[in-house]
Design a protein with these regions (language model features):
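Active-site environment of divalent metal-dependent phosphoester hydrolases
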Residues: 9-13, 40-43, 69-74, 157-158, ...
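Acidic, His/Gly-enriched loop-helix segments that form or flank divalent-metal centers
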Residues: 98, 104-205, 209-215, 221-236
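Short, glycine/charged-enriched secondary-structure capping and boundary segments
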Residues: 17-20, 47-50, 78-81, 164-165, ...
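Residue-level marker for buried hydrophobic side chains located in beta-strands
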Residues: 4, 32-34, 64-65, 149, ...
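Well-ordered alpha/beta subsegment
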Residues: 238-240
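Active-site neighborhood of divalent metal-dependent phosphoester bond hydrolases
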Residues: 28, 45-138, 176
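A general structural motif
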Residues: 27-30, 59-61, 146, 184
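N-terminal active-site segment of His-dependent metallophosphoesterases
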Residues: 1-51
Length: 240
């Protein structure tokens, strides 16, 4: 049995509720995989990071993977900010569409049109603890548990797992979600927001859209089946 949580996107209160549902179902310290995107859009990215760091430091059975938003955050905090080449031209991490502005706000850094980009960057580097940067930058990209393969975005169909690139593992979308190939294991991922976590035969999408205000719904995998965890208990996630 293993639990999983999709994209959190700064929703600390939702994360607390999801963890409470997991504890109610599985006890004090069951294995939990987080598939990335802890920052951006929601109101408390800092709080989410601190909660994850505290859990890992306390020895909880948590596997915390890295997502594309987590990488964008750490890249922005380099000596010279790096923009991810997967972004569309003219769209920066600080744009509200991506939500970097709310991440910096959780550290007390205001992103406004009246401020110079260099001043925002300098204040951000001073405000964000190096421990937070290191924690996100050092997260693994994948986790294998039996016939479950956990990853942030997905995999490149037809490419052996050891040859998958970091960019695909945290950024791939249409080439993965539109492919019905049997990958030889169930790919459990986030990244592509849906209305709720959904089983699609060859993959299980955990991203129920918490970054857009929808609930953060944890999932439990046990004996080849999957269930959503709700206040009423387990709800079977049938393949669609």
């Amino acid at each position: 049995m293993i639990y999983a949580i999709g994209d959190i996107h700064g929703q600390r209160a939702m994360l607390e509720r999801a963890l409470a549902l997991i504890e109610k179902d599985g006890g004090a310290n069951p294995p939990v995989v987080f598939v990335g995107d802890y920052t951006d859009r929601g109101p408390d990215s800092r709080g989410v990071i601190e909660m994850l760091m505290a859990g890992v430091a306390a020895g909880r059975s948590w596997t915390v993977l890295r997502g594309n938003h987590d990488r964008m955050f750490t890249w922005y905090l380099d000596d010279v900010p790096r923009e991810d080449p997967h972004l569309f031209h003219g769209l920066s991490w600080l744009n509200p569409r991506l939500g970097g502005n709310t991440t910096l706000a959780s550290y007390g850094v205001a992103v406004t049109e009246t401020r110079r980009t260099g001043d925002i960057h300098a204040e951000a580097r001073a405000a964000v603890p190096q421990a937070h940067i290191d924690f996100l930058a050092n997260r693994p990209l994948t986790h294998q548990h039996g016939d479950l393969f956990f990853v942030h975005a997905g995999i490149r169909p037809g490419v052996p797992i050891p040859e998958q690139t970091e960019n695909d593992l945290i950024w791939i979308r249409q080439d993965f979600v539109n492919d019905a190939t049997d990958h030889g294991r169930l790919i459990v991922h986030g990244h592509t927001a849906t209305d709720r976590p959904t089983h699609f035969f060859n993959r299980f999408n955990l991203d129920g859209g918490a970054g857009y205000g929808r609930p953060l719904i944890p999932v439990v995998f046990e004996d080849g089946q999957a269930w959503l965890l709700t206040d009423r208990g387990r709800v079977r996630a049938e393949a669609t």
